[in-house]
Each structure stands twice: as structure tokens, then as C-alpha cells.
Amino acid sequence: MYEKGFTIEVTSRYEGWWRYNAALMCGCFDAAGRRIGFASSASTVADVGSNLAERPADIAADRTAALQTMPCDHLVLYLYIIPHTLPADNEIDATRPFGIEVRISYARRRLRTEKREINQWSGASVEMRVDSKK
């Protein structure tokens, strides 16, 4: 798609990663702060409330949610991790937060990698501003 814009990738090694949908949305801005574009992408496994018993066969355990943008000075990214199937166990020890990794590149140059902890019950909403030059 755009080789000179931003690429955002979200992954997790958590075995229950399949229980979550991931949505990425961002506004792309020029150096003066004017929005010049918008991009969105989703990795949807199931409808919210599906309460699946196991990972669907057509969903890779190590799936990646990815978003590519047009070239721009900076973006404001919104990342949503949304549970569609809640944990089967109510014990706190069995439902500790799990990790995701967010990798952000611009024109194929890695800008940053962030690790985030996600609550198994509520998921997460993350907002990030990312400059193309940092």
C-alpha cells in the first residue's frame, strides 16, 4: 500500500489473544497540524458477546493487527483491544493482564516498539501521538 507512510503492527504471545478483536484508527497530520488523512484497520475474530469455547480454526494463534497510512508528519493513533469472549475463570490469578506489543515504523524505519498490559476483562483503549521524524 503506502511504503512511505506509517506502519503499525499489534501482536501478542498470549494464548488467549484470539478472544480479542483489535481496531486501529488514526488521523494523519501535516507539519502545521492540519489533518490530511485518516486510516483504519481491524482484526476481528468474532462479534462481541460471542463467548466462543475455542479459537476458530481460521484464526492464526499469532495473528497481527496492522495498519498502514499515507506519508504524513505525525499521526494520532487510537488502538482498541475489545474482548468478544470473556475469561472462563473468575479467579484473579487466572485472569492477570496479558501483554501486547505495538511496533511503529515510518517508511520502513522502526520508530518505536511498546509493550502494553491488557486487562482480560475490559480490554484497552490506547491513544498515542507518533512523529515521523523520531
Task: Tell me the role of every PLM-derived stretch.
Residues 62-69, 123-133:
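Exposed aromatic-hydrophobic patches
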Residues 1-36:
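Short, surface-exposed binding/anchoring microloops in extracellular/periplasmic proteins
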Residues 80-85, 97, 113-115:
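Extracellular or exported targeting regions of proteins
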